[in-house]
Amino acid sequence: MKQKREIWIDNVKVIACILVILGHFFQSMLKAQIVPGNRIYLWFNQSIYSFHVPLFFICSGYLYQKFSRIDSMSKWVRNIWKKLLVLGIPYFVFSSVQWLLKTMFSNTLNVEMDGFLQVLFAEPLSPYWYLYCLYFIFLITPTFNSGRSAVFISGTALILKLLKINGVYSNIYIIDVVMSNEIWFAMGMCLYAINITGFSQKKAARNLGCVSFIVFLIASMIHIPDTLFWEEGKAFYTGIWACAAVILLVAYSFRNSEQDTGFWGFFAKYTMPLFLMHTLFGATVRTLLLKAGTDSIAIHILIGIPVSFIGPVLLAEIMRRYRLDFFLYPGKYIFKK
């Protein structure tokens, strides 16, 4: 029997994607010295970076536990091969394109690029590091098949995170990034195991979501350091409240929805293209405006933000028409039923 689609998952990813796009846009504006790094900007950047990508990991963990059963070597091998194609093809394609563009326009963008192989295999670019990290999380994480396995996997993920918070590093990128993010993936698996969708039918979910949001706001404003990001401990503790607020409020709001429509339906359809291509369009617009001698904050925002959203959507439609959306959704073509 086909399982009912859970609309709230799509819409949580929509929120995460929008915040990722805005975060990258304004961060690149700061690096190009177009916007000042004042307290308001620092608070915004620190706050959203504590939870926007964690939301993606939580959604991935939830869907992994819901649709997969990795309890044998043969299933593990099949899953890893599938994830290598589904995540690896867009990762390598769009990482290569971004590396090429940033290398060509490094002087204008005020960035210094690492070597091509270094970027692909050792220190991925944003936002593609998420796909890179997610693959390795799939590589090491079995699904829960009992309460004991749930405790073991979640406990291990928490220990890894606490070690990282307390300064235990390997100085190997992939190990450190998995240590940071395995916990969010495990949280997503736990949410499915405890039936968060069922809980979202109750008003208690809405109330808890509101409380979580208030706690997040208070925690985020207690101390705003002169850095782009909080230290890992504060980002984790604050991010938990933000993720809880988003998930509970979105799940409650869409508890009776069977399909996305309007704003949510549109963005849910294009989450992957937006995630993969927003930096390409944003960087291109910023480069052209700077080359034209325009450093007005208003002009960069009024042109750059719409193009960061509209550009990927239009290109995704063109790619779909010529079946080039294979590079966005390789699984749609490789694993046809």
Specify the residue positions occupied by each region the protein language model found:
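Membrane-cytosol interface segments of multi-pass membrane proteins
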Residues: M1-I159, A292-K337
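Aromatic-anchored segments of alpha-helical transmembrane domains
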Residues: I21-F25, S96, G155-V168, C210-P225, ...
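Juxtamembrane "helix-exit" motif on the non-cytosolic side of transmembrane helices
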Residues: M29-I34, T103-T108, L163-N171, A219-F229, ...
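Interfacial loop-to-helix transition and helix-capping segments at the boundaries
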Residues: W43-V53, Q118-Y132, I165-M187, S220-V246
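Structural signal for the C-terminal ends of transmembrane alpha-helices
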Residues: Y64-S72, P142-G147, M187-F199, I222, ...
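Short juxtamembrane and helix-loop transition motifs at transmembrane-helix boundaries
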Residues: T108-F121, Y135-T143, K164-N171, T197-G198, ...
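Hydrophobic alpha-helical segments of polytopic membrane proteins
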Residues: T143, R148-G155, G188, I194-L217
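Alpha-helical transmembrane segments and terminal signal-anchor/GPI-anchor hydrophobic tails
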Residues: G198-F266, Y270, L280-A283, L288, ...
